[in-house]
Amino acid sequence: GYFMDPTNKHMSSLLLKCGLPGGMMGSMMADLKGVHSGINLILRSKNEPELSIDDLLVMLFDEVEYVWPKLGYPPLVTPFSQYVKNVALMNVMSLIKGEERWTMIDNHTWDMILGKSGRLPGALAPEIIALAKEKGYEFTDEDPQKNYPDQLDEYRKEMTENSWDFGQDDEEL
């Protein structure tokens, strides 16, 4: 928490175009630095010019701008902004390797796409819907809160059994 890469503040204005929150800059740069050498290794093996970290950052922002509407315009707040960034980064890596987009989507992102986190503000792109069907995934429009039943009575019982203080109101539980 105390160290911030000094280059982050110089590049954060690039976030305006793709819409990602500025608070993601540190983790995003760490992700990029983590894959940078691997990407350049792939490019060298294909006799293609290597990318600077700045070039890679611009590619990532362009890909975020591309994937965000295709994923139904999820709100770019935690955790959805990370999902969008992760899909974009995986797409960039896939494209550099000569593969197609959408080959590496993690389970949390699929849960968002399928509606398990609630309805997305926009429509999913037909290619995303087709990919989900191809994988045998099912979409849902159920209330995501049903996945988290009220357990307040269980917590009260546990607190009583352990002689723990209940606090001043239910919010403190």
Predicted feature residues:
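A structural-propensity feature for long, helix-poor, extended segments
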Residues: G1-F3
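Terminal or standalone catalytic/regulatory effector modules within metabolic enzymes
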Residues: K9-L173
